[in-house]
Amino acid sequence: MTDSLPFQLPRRPSVTLLRQGDGGRPARPAPNQPMAGFESRFTDIVNYIVRITDEIWAERAVGYIYDTYDANCTIYSSYGTVRSVEEVIASTVATLNAYPDGELQHLNVAWSGDEQAGFYTSHLGHSRSTNVGRTPWGPGTGRRTSIRFVADCISHNNRIHTEWLVRDNGAAVRQLGQDIHAVAQGIAATIQIETRLVSPEPRLQGQTLRARLELDETSVEGWARALFHDVWNLRRLDWLKSRYADDVLAHAGGGRAAHGLRNYQALVLHVLAAIPDGTMRVEHVSWSEEADGVVVAVRWLLEGRSAPGGVLGECPPGKPVFMMGMSHLRLAAGKVVEEWMLFDELGVLAQTYR
């Protein structure tokens, strides 16, 4: 499976494969990864993430959050920062009240780390539900929603202490029949306790144009960082053909999809058009070896100034914004054949109205 990869994978313990389970449930192998400090029932870090997610969200064990999140946990999103387990519980209760019949599908959990240093996981999931109760955007609508999310977490001794969360709220708002710009203006009018300051980086470094990074592209992290820099910072979309399959399938924020390399390039341009002076920064890289190929997970940040005409629509121009994103890239025959590119355009759009 790994012979044709453009990078080398280091040896590490085998873990649960999500796409080999019965009826969408992950297989439960014999314990195969050291998990000191975690409950003995968890066989590996993927098993831990999937099971606590199912128990909290599907089985309604909301109070189990006290056992799996640190009391002073920090959760980052496009809307601000949460710094308390009580806020996590309050948000979970409100979401379950708004979407009481939610169904979860676990698409991938990339990971890194170990029991001593702690584990980093990037959990890509798909949620289907009916909006019955009030959401932050208004009363229940009775409409169905189908959205993806990614939660990147750092866990140690059975508790998550840091998380970065991206939920496709752009798709959710549209599926609920609401105007995304009106919703964004409402969010912008609310008071935030903690906001992120954005100072866009200049595109030029003095009189010197941006150059390729000197990286070891035989490593997973080096390969991913070089890819994102070449495409998003150097804007060399023509180089995609050496890394992406001609029939690549992409799923992006806002419920967007692209099939084929040409359409994938158009998708990237649509994102860049919204932040045309944007600078891409890769913040973390992890990976998983699934039944249908290796998946590389990248947490990234795109910072710059807003412009109308891209994924943000007719937004106020020239506003400093940041787009927090997570991408999961599945490889086969040495190239990317499928990508999940998650970002929350609603959260970015709200920044343009502040």
List the model feature ranges, each with a label.
Residues T2-R354:
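C-terminal and inter-domain tail/linker signature
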